[in-house]
UniProtKB/Swiss-Prot annotation:
This is Uncharacterized protein TM_1467.1. It comes from Thermotoga maritima (strain ATCC 43589 / DSM 3109 / JCM 10099 / NBRC 100826 / MSB8). The chain crosses the membrane at residues 41-61, 133-153. It is a multi-pass membrane protein. Keywords: Cell membrane, Membrane, Transmembrane, Transmembrane helix. The lineage of its organism: Bacteria, Thermotogati, Thermotogota, Thermotogae, Thermotogales.
Length: 168
C-alpha cells in the first residue's frame, strides 16, 4: 500500500505545484533512505529488520524539520518495534487476512490472539477504490499521514522576507 500512498501523494504534489517545494529541501543522509528496504529483503531478519528501521529512523530524525518526517519517524518506530519483537516479521491478524482473502508474503506472519507483541500489528482492513486490499497497522497510518503532509502541504519555508523597521 505504501506505493499507492506514495503515488497518490506525488500526483497531488504535482497537481498542486508543491513538488517544487519537495525538491528544495536539503535532505541529510539521503543514502539511508533506500538501504533499509534492501536490508529487509535479505535473510537474517532478526538482525537486519531492526537495523533497517534504525536507519530509517535516523533518516527521519536528521530531517525532522521537513514537514511530515516526525510522523513518519514515529510510524517507523512503531512498525520496527513490532517487527523486531516478532522475529523480523510484521504480524497480521488472521481473521482480517481471511476477510480480505489475502495471502501472507515473506515479510508477514499470521496471528490469532492479541498480546503485547501484536498490539501494534497489521489488523486494520483497507479497500482501495481500484480494487486493491491491504491490512495495515497504526504505524502504517502515521507513515501515510506523514507522506501526505510531506508531499501535499505547502511548507512554511525558513526564508521569510526580512522586515525593515520604518524610519521616522
Amino acid at each position: 500500500m505504501m506505493i499507492d500512498v506514495f503515488l497518490i501523494a506525488l500526483l497531488l504534489s504535482i497537481l498542486t505545484g508543491n513538488i517544487k517545494n519537495v525538491l528544495k529541501y536539503n535532505y541529510k543522509g539521503l543514502y539511508l533512505f533506500a538501504i533499509p528496504f534492501v536490508l529487509q529483503l535479505l535473510p537474517w531478519k532478526e538482525i537486519l529488520v531492526p537495523l533497517s528501521f534504525v536507519m530509517l529512523f535516523l533518516f527521519f530524525i536528521w530531517n525532522r524539520n521537513i514537514p511530515g518526517f516526525k510522523l513518519m519517524a514515529i510510524g517507523a518506530v512503531l512498525n520496527g518495534f513490532t517487527m523486531s519483537v516478532n522475529g523480523g516479521k510484521m504480524p497480521v491478524w488472521e481473521p482480517t487476512l481471511k476477510l480480505l482473502n489475502l495471502d501472507l508474503d515473506f515479510k508477514h506472519t499470521a496471528f490469532t490472539e492479541f498480546s503485547w507483541k501484536t498490539l501494534l500489528a497489521d489488523y486494520i482492513p483497507v479497500y482501495l477504490p481500484w480494487g486493491r486490499k491491504f491490512v495495515i497497522s497504526v504505524g502504517d497510518i502515521l507513515v501515510f499521514i506523514g507522506v501526505f503532509i510531506f508531499f501535499v502541504l505547502k511548507p512554511r519555508f525558513q526564508t521569510q522576507p526580512s522586515r525593515v523597521p520604518h524610519e521616522s
